[in-house]
From Swiss-Prot:
Keywords: Arabinose catabolism, Carbohydrate metabolism, Metal-binding, NAD, Nucleotide-binding, Oxidoreductase, Zinc. Induction: Induced by L-arabinose, D-xylose, xylitol, L-arabinitol, and galactitol. Pathway: Carbohydrate degradation; L-arabinose degradation via L-arabinitol; D-xylulose 5-phosphate from L-arabinose (fungal route): step 2/5. The gene is lad. Zn(2+) 2 binds at C110, C113, C116, C124. Belongs to the zinc-containing alcohol dehydrogenase family. Binds 2 Zn(2+) ions per subunit. Homotetramer. Zn(2+) 1 binds at C55, H80, E81, E165. This is L-arabinitol 4-dehydrogenase. GO terms for molecular function: L-arabinitol 4-dehydrogenase activity; L-iditol 2-dehydrogenase (NAD+) activity; nucleotide binding; zinc ion binding. NAD(+) binds at P192, I193, D213, R218, I293, Q317, Y318, R319. It is an enzyme of class 1 (oxidoreductase).
Length: 388
């Protein structure tokens, strides 16, 4: 550890297990290992985590114990949306130094398989993605991570640095979906990823834009975030085709059935819910695209003949690759402003309360941040105005 850096707080982490318990306890590396550097491997740096966002997948691992084949089988540390400050570097690391502020890209790849060698490392066959069982996550006070996956953020706030991860998810979708200037776009779902995607499609020049959700409060939030967006509240008692008609009405000032009505060229589906995917398919224009960012169940039914006879492309993504430098530029240069997304903040010691807040729809939480100290919370709250 570099001279001049004094650490006193023990390392703690936020755990879940197959019994769906959630608790805060001691974590590796220990404070003594951090101070001595005994646990630091070649190519790694030690980062003091200052801000971590709670992702929907974190809540899902806690409540459901799995996402598809990714199963919690023992005590497991959550979290993969983090930023902090470098406090130690391995002797062979030349790109970072103690004191550097970094955002952590939460994957460790093999650099040997075909996806890695062709630049699509999100498909690495041996990836260790932090917080995905059995690999522990970043909801800790200190963590050792490969320097190559720690991106310098300069004077960007740690909170914005943590939000680069969900922004990367949206940017990966934008790249593959091919949203263009002037495209009519549907964003399905006004959760955190849907709202970040909304910011991205607006910045890309899409117009008009309509966003959907079942929660009127989230739609109001979307309208505050992007005033020009149209909103549609999904009616759970209606069919996918009927909700699509409502989406088109919202996009066309109530005239969605008119012969010259605008249909989305691209639907960015951010929920993974079967009925929402189907509504998106019924909504887009002939030759349009439904791009699914959201994670859903293993199997689902879709209106195949609509896809076929309207030549609609149905496309998906898995995590992200090569997005972090772009995300940093977008935030640093003010093209994307993520600050309003943070609605609640908690210190690491109160992580259980933070998760309960994130998981409860009655709290109105959009993005909940877990921060290293009350001082960091006060500093961030003074800028962004969120509460705990």
């Amino acid at each position: 550890m570099a001279a001049g850096i004094s650490l006193t707080k023990p390392n703690i982490g936020v755990y879940t297990n197959p019994n769906h318990d959630l608790w805060v306890a001691d974590a590796k590396p220990t404070l003594e290992e951090v101070k001595s550097g005994s646990d630091l491997k070649p190519g790694q740096v030690t980062v003091e985590i200052r801000s971590t966002g709670i992702c929907g997948s974190d809540v899902h691992f806690w409540h459901a114990g799995c996402i598809g084949p990714m199963i919690v089988t023992g005590d497991h540390i959550l979290g993969h949306e983090s930023a902090g400050v470098v406090i130690a570097v391995a002797p062979d690391v030349k790109t970072l130094k103690p004191g550097d502020r970094v955002a952590i890209e939460p994957n460790i790849i093999c650099n040997k398989c075909e996806p890695c060698l062709t630049g699509r490392y999100n498909g690495c066959e041996a990836v260790e993605f932090l917080s995905t069982p059995p690999v522990d996550g970043l909801l800790r006070r200190y963590v050792n991570h490969p320097a190559i996956w720690c991106h310098k953020i300069g004077d960007m706030s740690f909170e914005d640095g943590a939000l680069l991860e969900p922004l990367s998810v949206a940017l990966a979708g934008m790249d593959r979906a091919g949203v263009r200037l002037g495209d009519p776009v549907l964003v399905a779902g006004a959760g955190p990823i849907g709202l970040v995607t909304l910011l991205c499609v607006r910045a890309a020049g899409a117009t008009p834009i309509v966003i959907t959700d079942i929660d009127e409060g989230r739609l109001r939030f979307a309208k505050e975030l992007v005033p020009e967006v149209r909103t549609y509240r999904v009616q759970t008692g209606l069919s996918a085709e009927e909700n699509a008609a409502g989406i088109l009405d919202a996009l066309n000032d109530g005239n969605g059935s008119a012969p010259d009505a605008i249909r989305p060229r691209v639907a960015m589906e951010c929920t993974g819910v079967e009925s929402s995917v189907a509504s998106a398919i019924w909504s887009v224009k002939f030759g349009g695209k439904v791009f699914v960012i959201g994670v859903g169940k293993n199997e689902m039914k879709v209106p195949f003949m609509r896809l076929s006879t309207w030549e609609i492309d149905l496309q998906y993504q898995y995590r992200y690759c090569n997005t972090w430098p772009k995300a940093i530029r977008l935030v640093k240069n003010g093209v994307i402003n993520l600050k309003k997304l943070v609605t609640h903040r908690f210190p690491l010691e109160d992580a259980v309360k933070a998760f309960e807040t994130a998981a409860n729809p009655k709290t109105g939480a959009i993005k909940v941040q877990i921060m290293s100290s009350e001082e960091d919370i006060k500093a961030a709250s003074g800028v962004n105005g969120a509460s705990n």
